[in-house]
Amino acid sequence: MRYLFVALAVLLASTLVSAQAPAPVSGPLTRHYRDGETLTYRMTATNEDWHYTADVSGTAKKTVNGSTVEEFRWTGMTSNGQPIKLTPAMAQFRENLSLDPNWTPSAPDMGKTDPKMSGPILDFMTFYVDLWLVNKVGILQHAGDHFYVPNPQTSSWADGNQVIVGKDQIDFDLNLQSIDPVKQTAVVVVHHVPPSHPNLQLPAEWMQAPVADTANNWVEVKKSDDGKFEAGVGKETFDVTIIVSTADGRILSASMDNPVVTSSRTCDDAALTKCGVPQPHTIHRHIEIALVH
């Protein structure tokens, strides 16, 4: 099963914004934390032919520098309708996330997690860091406001073993789509789009040709068990929609659509020069979270 670690790109963008953004302004999306507050979410996801659910609960607590963080623990998972027993390491694993603009996001230690949970952990982080990014920028105050964040950096999910190369590059279009004063909710939409001129270092000449209607911004090379190389290139986008409580800034629900339009070849050599015919393919993931209590 192929994981697309889009959350890592969001972290890179958050680093850039942290260095450039002015002090955040309180607005309709501001998170008002209560120390000890606990939130529980249910994630429902489809990754091509794989369907899964996962449950996560987090408790708010103050950090030593005065910001607030939510310490999340993953409590359960089902795969294609069947309960999955998580590894003992997951009982100790904590995922620290926050919507406090004074906090700086960081990647979790994935070496201490159950491999089956990589997708849920990183996708959940994407929802949080996307909204954190909106709060950090601090200028989305009214329905229709938007802000574009160019991202010159690439993110990588290569592990050096099976995944030899795994990179993407995306820009961010932040939008405050609507505010409902009666329901006390706001709709935030974050479009993750290819840069006009990605600076990906593509490992083969045949990867330069655009697969879709933009320059390629996604590349992956995996080594198969028979010693061959599965190489693909293409266009990745994803759209995140977040329903936010304007009363306290909590995420009430969210969804993410993540299509990748690719062209892949099976190659005999690591230089990717002795390859078979191109095979078009579209990878599609859809993830939703909902606040349970």
What are these regions (language model features)?
Residues M1-L4:
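Positively charged n-region of N-terminal signal peptides that target proteins for export
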Residues Q20-H293:
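Signature of exported/secreted
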